[in-house]
Amino acid sequence: MRNFFLIPIFATLMLLFVSNDGNAQAKKASTIQVIQFHSEHRCMTCNKIEELARVALKKYPAIPFSLVNADDKKNEKQCTQFQAYGSSLFLYNTKTKKIKNLTEMAFMNAGDQDKFIKEFNKNLDTFLKS
């Protein structure tokens, strides 16, 4: 009989711990952004990188994706901050200001969706933990 009362209490406590961990993950993810810089005239590969990054980010709905036109003068400060003067892909932590350049990975794997998503997610998971 005593176990009958302890089981619901234990289950409730477990749910609280699990939901708190999920909130911590969401808070961490909300400080991360994925930013793709591009020039005015975009090539097929640049468009494909955008498409694949958006597909990969479906696993992380709290992480925003943004496109920045590197040729637009209003984006000059941001381009300088990231040293992005053409097509490039970055992970950015708004809290720590840490930047991870994924440009080489993106261009190397743009032709293979599965490999791109695997490498992108691996990099993003590592970035989230740092």
Name each region found by the language model.
Residues 1-6:
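Positively charged n-region of N-terminal signal peptides that target proteins for export
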Residues 62-75:
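Thiol-based oxidoreductase modules, predominantly thioredoxin-like and allied folds used
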Residues 27-57:
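Local sequence-structure signature of Cys/Sec-based thiol-disulfide redox active-site neighborhoods
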Residues 7-17:
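Bacterial N-terminal signal peptides
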Residues 79-92:
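Structural micro-motif
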Residues 91-130:
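Non-catalytic, surface beta->alpha helical segment in thiol-disulfide oxidoreductase systems
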Residues 20-24:
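Sec/Tat signal peptide C-region and signal peptidase I cleavage site
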